[in-house]
Amino acid sequence: MFGKKNLKWLGVVATLMMTFVQLGGALVTKTGSADGCGSSWPLCHGALIPEFFPIDTIIELSHRAVSALSLLMVLWLVITAWKHIGYIKEIKPLSIISVGFLLLQALIGAAAVIWQQNDYVLALHFGISLISFSSVFLITLIIFSIDQKYEADELYIKKPLRRLTWLMAIIIYCGVYTGALVRHADASLAYGGWPLPFHDLVPHSEQDWVQLTHRIMAFIVFTIIMITYIHAVKNYPNNRTVHYGYTAAFILVILQVITGALSIMTNVNLLIALFHALFITYLFGMTTYFIMLMLRSVRSDKQ
């Protein structure tokens, strides 16, 4: 059960499960299904199996079930990884972070159901689950990197790219928070057209300000990632890890901008909104991978 041969498929399945947790949370918010089980948690309408199954109850129950299964899968993964590749420096802290933040995510979700938190607190939920996802994602990448098909272990990232990548990570996380706040504050269609309502640029409500703030953050995120991408491919032309990694990040942020614009133009089409959540999830995951490589470079500086 905890054999080393299980590591790769466990990593892939756990990463996919955590992806579904992210998408499930976005689906719950987008469809207004957060109250699908009333104010009961972990029960649903005070029962293990509710009497009726309207669509909002099905969505909320499905999200809870996937979250519970993902916790079990992540526990299986981290125990197996700790046992067999715990000698790799990042495995143990990533294991603790992945489980800890997954539990914290569940507690915040439960608190939201029971005590009806305000929008600004609820917006933290997606960001916390994103940290847990990224930890599982990194464990999986480490497992596959043991084969040494890429030169990531020998990669040395210099200070300019390190600074840009740290800035990129911070800005992305701020963008994630404002995006989650847009969903929770019901501001997806606020502040008129995209990119700006040129007939009336002045925000007139809290929702307008939330939406405008997110658009400004999205523009900053795109700009920072574009600058970082250009710097990376220009200064590390022969390193596949940097070249492919930062190219993937730039493609993901382009897709993120496109789906964000289409969400507004289509009056928040559900499928487009879910892709919007998917792209930012993997963009942040890629960024944490760059940070892990950077920290290895910092350690090599000290040695």
Curated annotation (Swiss-Prot):
Binding-site list for heme o: H63, H125
Pathways per UniProt: Porphyrin-containing compound metabolism; heme A biosynthesis; heme A from heme O: step 1/1
Named cofactor requirement(s): heme b
Presence of the UniProt keyword Transmembrane in the record: yes
Extracellular topology ranges: 30-67, 115-125, 185-215, 266-270
Cytoplasmic side: 1-8, 89-93, 147-163, 237-244, 292-303
Any one GO BP annotation for this protein: heme A biosynthetic process
Catalytic activity field: Fe(II)-heme o + 2 A + H2O = Fe(II)-heme a + 2 AH2
Family: Belongs to the COX15/CtaA family. Type 1 subfamily.
Protein name from the UniProt record: Heme A synthase
Species: Staphylococcus aureus (strain MSSA476)
Lineage of the organism: Bacteria, Bacillati, Bacillota, Bacilli, Bacillales
